[in-house]
C-alpha cells in the first residue's frame, strides 16, 4: 500500500485529519493561499 500525499489548504487540516491524514510540512503559499503537505500513511 502506497502512502497518499496531498497539498491541502491550511483551513481544511482538521477535515483531512478526520480521514487519517497527518501534517507533513510547514505552511507554504500557493497562489497566495496557505497550504500544508499532508500524508495518509
Feature locations, PLM:
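A secondary-structure capping/hinge motif
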Residues: 23-25
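Short, high-confidence coil segments that cap the C-terminus of an alpha-helix
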Residues: 1-3
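Conserved active-site tyrosine of GNAT-family acetyltransferases
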Residues: 16, 21
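C-terminal "cap" of GNAT-fold acetyltransferases
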Residues: 6-13, 27-41
